[in-house]
Amino acid sequence: MHTVRIPKVIKFGENALGETEYPKNALVVTTVPPELSDKWLAKMGIQDYMLYDQVKPEPSIDDVNAVISEYKSKNPSVLIGLGGGSSMDVVKYAAPEMKKEKILIPTTFGSGSEVTRISVLKVNGKKTSFHNDALLADVAIIDPYFINSAPFEIIKNSAIDACAQCTEAYDSKNGNSYTKFLCNKAFDFLEKGVLNDDKEKIVL
């Protein structure tokens, strides 16, 4: 028997950010400075929210505890992980602890963290991978807006990451016909996105 676990809702495509209605009093968790997060939040069209932007790269359980300690009493309606894997990993773990739903919005691509049941956090200085259905997003929003303005180096690394993830998933002993179908479609999209018009030279 095979089991496929995915978020309750996945919204993807151009303008997915702006066409989503966000609950009032949401807590947005990110790693980026205000000059960038302000631009992203304006694109989202979110009005009533709290912002926590102190998450560090490669976060630890201490980052999770800091979010819970500061915001649990403020009773946010939902936690929104906006950014790379660091902010999403923190929200994945913190939201169940606060008994709140979570929205994950990746600003890069490649790992697919927004649709997995995995959160990677440092515990006592050591990276630890947590696996649990409670870590799945309630809503994942994937919008190409972020990639259009991303530095080339991030696009390149994300594309390489996506290729590696697809290859690993396709060859996984836990794979099945459904996951292999998704991998094949991903390879098709990657070929179109990574190769240039003459199909001979890799843009990367």
Which role does the model predict for each range below?
Residues 9, 25-27, 77-80, 101-106, ...:
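Structural motif
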Residues 35-38, 61, 86-93, 112-115:
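Short glycine/serine/threonine-rich phosphate/pyrophosphate-binding segments
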Residues 67, 90-95, 166-167, 187-193:
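Buried hydrophobic packing segments
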Residues 97-181, 185-186:
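A glycine/threonine-rich phosphate-anchoring loop and its flanking beta-alpha core
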Residues 186-204:
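Oxyanion-binding "anion nests"
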